[in-house]
Amino acid sequence: MSLLTEVETYVLSIVPSGPLKAEIAQRLEDVFAGKNTDLEALMEWLKTRPILSPLTKGILGFVFTLTVPSERGLQRRRFVQNALNGNGDPNNMDRAVKLYRKLKREITFHGAKDVALSYSTGALASCMGLIYNRMGTVTTEVAFGLVCATCEQIADSQHRSHRQMMTTTNPLIRHENRMVLASTTAKAMEQMAGSSEQAAEAMEVASQARQMVQAMRTIGTHPSSSAGLKDDLLENLQAYQKRMGVQIQRFK
């Protein structure tokens, strides 16, 4: 796996699924391939994206700045600086300085990542802030190691909370989660449908599912009534894909 592929993988792991994730993936690919060289326009686009947390925007801004060649005097962006200040906690800043000194001695991506993984997310963000604000310099490889360590920590905590939700025994949360998943699957079906004859069928199935979820939410239903809703939808989606000659397993 190349270095940039690894960076893209880690960064995308902290972006919530949806159309915006696909857009960000495309931007990252373009930046890494040297196709997008307008850093200012890129940062303006990033700043106005909805849904993303300030820290995720800060990390993406840091990656774009590291990768896109720019004039020396180009202004640093406030939204990135604010996201990478470790919540203004002086402890984070102290640890960030210690980490920075260690990173200065590293020359490889994996070496930097291993060193960084033993620090808290706040300290890692502050350390990125130091480098972003030109208070310290490290090689691009080392900076990417720092980015990936930060993303790994964030993804770990997201995974823990996701797993807690998936394994909860609270029937109301499980019911709502099934309905949300059914809704997003229906949305994906509509986006994939295109304009063929079979597409009308897929659209119809998706539309019925969304109406059903809406009705369940409006009138209130027994928490077990949503069981199988997403699975039925996925079955329909896979049957539709087979007829279209497409095989996509990723929805599971």
From Swiss-Prot:
Q: Does the keyword RNA-binding belong to this entry?
A: yes
This protein's source sits in the domain of life called: Viruses
Q: Which UniProt keywords apply?
A: Host nucleus, Membrane, RNA-binding, Viral matrix protein, Virion
Q: Which GO terms describe its biological process?
A: viral budding from plasma membrane
Where does the UniProt annotation locate this protein?
Answer: Virion membrane; Host nucleus
| GO MF term (any one) | structural constituent of virion
Q: Find motif (Nuclear localization signal) and give its ranges.
A: 101-105
Q: Where is this region: RNP-binding?
A: 165-252
Q: Where is this region: Membrane-binding?
A: 1-164
Q: Where does the UniProt entry say this protein principally localizes? A: virion
Q: How does it assemble?
A: Homodimer and homomultimer. Interacts with NEP. Binds ribonucleocapsid by both interacting with genomic RNA and NP protein. May interact with HA and NA. Cannot bind NP without genomic RNA.
**UniProt function note:** Plays critical roles in virus replication, from virus entry and uncoating to assembly and budding of the virus particle. M1 binding to ribonucleocapsids (RNPs) in nucleus seems to inhibit viral transcription. Interaction of viral NEP with M1-RNP is thought to promote nuclear export of the complex, which is targeted to the virion assembly site at the apical plasma membrane in polarized epithelial cells. Interactions with NA and HA may bring M1, a non-raft-associated protein, into lipid rafts. Forms a continuous shell on the inner side of the lipid bilayer in virion, where it binds the RNP. Determines the virion's shape: spherical or filamentous. Clinical isolates of influenza are characterized by the presence of significant proportion of filamentous virions, whereas after multiple passage on eggs or cell culture, virions have only spherical morphology. Filamentous virions are thought to be important to infect neighboring cells, and spherical virions more suited to spread through aerosol between hosts organisms.
- Protein family membership: Belongs to the influenza viruses Matrix protein M1 family.
Other remarks on record?
A: Most abundant protein in virion. When expressed alone can form virus-like particles in transfected cells.
Name the UniProt record assigns to this protein:
Matrix protein 1
Q: Which organism is it from?
A: Influenza A virus (strain A/Shearwater/Australia/1972 H6N5)
